[in-house]
């Protein structure tokens, strides 16, 4: 399954907000440098969905397509 993520790095909190069935807004504490925000995003989504997660597109963007498997 693929989902669309809008990441908000350096927000001071960790939170996943469901916008609709395939779109989520994710607040991250980490800054978007040295891959820190992406690693935090993967960790949060894995815990939220209880599935393996990977970034399909948008590695350097705040809007990403994620694959759950």
Label each residue range with its predicted role:
Residues 1-34, 39-43, 47, 51-69:
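Contiguous, often N-terminal, cationic amphipathic patches that form binding interfaces
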């Amino acid at each position: 399954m693929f989902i669309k993520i809008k990441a908000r790095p350096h927000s001071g909190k960790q939170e996943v907000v469901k916008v609709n069935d395939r779109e989520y807004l994710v607040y991250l504490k980490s800054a978007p440098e040295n891959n820190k925000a992406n690693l935090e995003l993967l960790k949060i989504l894995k815990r939220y969905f209880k599935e393996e997660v990977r970034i399909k597109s948008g590695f350097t963007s705040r809007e990403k397509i994620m694959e759950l498997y």
